[in-house]
Each structure stands twice: as C-alpha cells, then as structure tokens.
Amino acid sequence: MAVGNFHTIDASRGVKVLLTDEPGDIEICADDNLIEYVRVGIDGGELKITVAPRIHAVPSEQILVRVPYNGNIRKLEASSAAKIVAKTLFTGRMLEIEASSAARIRVDAQVETCEIDASSSAKVVAQIDADRLEADASSASSILLQGAVQKAVFEASSAASIDARKLVAHFCEAEASSAADIRVYCEQALQSRTSSAGSVSYAGPCSVNSADTSGGSTRGAANNELK
C-alpha cells in the first residue's frame, strides 16, 4: 500500500505497528488466515490500522504493519492491546501520544512540546527532549521516561505510575492521587500535590513546595530508588 499524506497513526485491536526510516510502501505481515481482515486506510489525515470486527480475538503480535516515517506524524494513538514501536526519531514542534486499554507505545522524540496520556493498563516508554512535557497516567497504566525537558507537568491517579527518574527536568509539577506513584528528577523547583495514598518521590538539587492530604506523601528518593 502506498504511503499517503497523514499526520496521525491510530492502531487498535492487537496489531503491531513498526515505524521505520526505510523508504517504501506500507507493508502488512500476517498469517494467510488473518491478512484479509487487516484494515489499513487514511481518513481525515489519520492512518487507521485495525482488524475487521468479525475477528473476535487477534493473537498477540500476529499482525505486523510496517509504516515508513513521512516526517509529518504529530500524533500516535494505540488502543485495545495494539502496539506502536518507532524506530525513528520524531522531530518538530509537537507530538501527542495516547495509549489505552492495554496498548503499548515506544517512541523517541526531540520536539518543542510533548503530551502523553496513558490509561486502562496501557504503557508508554519514551525518550523525550523538549521544552515542555505533559504526562497523564490513570487506571493502572504506566509511563516510563528518559531525556531532558525544561518543564514537566505530571498527573497520575488510580494506581497508575510515572517513572521519570531518568528524565532531567528543570521545573516540575507533579500531582498523584488514589494510590498512584510519580518519581522524578528535578534540578530547580518541584511543586508536588498528593492525596488518597498517592506519592511523589524526587531526586535532584531542587527546591520543593508540597501539599499532601489524605495519606498522600512527598519525599526525597532513597539511593536504591534512583536506579
């Protein structure tokens, strides 16, 4: 399938999408009994990759779709156990990442602004270099971050986690609630808000302004937590 003009990739229903720097067309790899049910198409600037509804269960990673990076992608969406793995570096002004319902996204980016949202047991692993990063994790999802940003804004709830110990942030705002956990490395100033057994742990030479209620906690990280 020829590569068209799209700015968003939307993957769902257990498919695995591999973004590469290699030129060429979109390539679908699947067993003969599945390939006819793979749906790949562009609608309103979105490249949608899924499986026909008549297939009730898709075996894990049995469908692989290789997509050449076109330089225009600004949003990645994965849901329903789909996976997006980027083997290319995203650059530009903005990148949005959304993962839900046990989906997985892995990406590296050098952008001005990055927004990450993970929910319902999804996982995002990202190397981010940006001026501003916003990350929101909920409902047992997880976000694992590396890189460097000028300002980071984190929010985690309902047993979700954000691990940013290997992300150097100059300024950071972190809010954790309902047994969620946020771990950060901050160099200048941290504002922390916790409630309902949420926790924020921090490392780095930052000043800390915290507001903890209903069993929430803000604390400096122990040495073994920095690894």
What is each model feature region?
Residues V17, I84-V85, I105, V124, ...:
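Short loop/beta submotifs within extracellular cysteine-rich repeat domains
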Residues S120, S139, K166, V184, ...:
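Low-complexity, compositionally biased segments
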Residues S12-R13, S79-S80, S100-S101, S119-S120, ...:
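Ser/Thr/Pro-rich low-complexity tandem-repeat tracts
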Residues E155-A156, S161-S192:
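Glycine/small-residue-rich hydrophobic helix-like segments
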Residues M1-S100, R106-E115, V125-E134, Q146-V153, ...:
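Acidic (Asp/Glu) and glycine-rich low-complexity loops/linkers
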